[in-house]
Amino acid sequence: MNLDRDLLLPTSLPLVKICGVRTPADLEACAAAGANAVGLVFAPGSPRELAPTEVIDLIAEMPDELEPIALFVDPANDLVDAWPGAWIQLHGEETPERVTAIAAMTGHRIIKAIPFDADAVLAWDEHPDVEILLIDGPRGGSGEPFDHAALAPLLATLAKPVIIAGGLDPETVAEVVRGLQPFGVDVSSGVESTHGVKDHDRIRAFVTAARG
């Protein structure tokens, strides 16, 4: 696949990202369902963490319809620099200065994940090296939601596109999309049968509900 292209610009919003994919079959299910992007997890200790050989296999099998996004948590320079794709998602406690350094070192385009806090959202919206904000629950990948009603008044004031994560699943995503009209939605545990194992029927149901 071409890893140098831009993040997919969907013909109809929201963009749908399925995070924590681990197998070629997961990729096929995401592409068949109509997802736009997939998240490959490099976070130590996560049930979705990928070994280097698994990453190589997934990149080789990546459908052209999907944009791969690497998810890092406070990464070391060599790890983040080795990612061959265009986009990374920083999901740790990276400071604004660290994000600037990563952007300068790697040239990667950056999605910054933020546990919802109004002041933090406004501050990261002004960061010149962050292109997309991903607003999450208290603990990424846990399925814990945040107060969407508290975010709603902020959205119109933000300059950057916003992806909503945290507690989404096929049963809840449609209401969130109707209420917030975000650029994108992100799901991980909400489309799993067990921790770290994607349920392909739930992936299809999630994409259908998000776009419905």
Identify the residue ranges that each predicted region occupies.
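Conserved N-terminal beta1-alpha1 strand-loop-helix module at the mouth
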Residues: 1-212
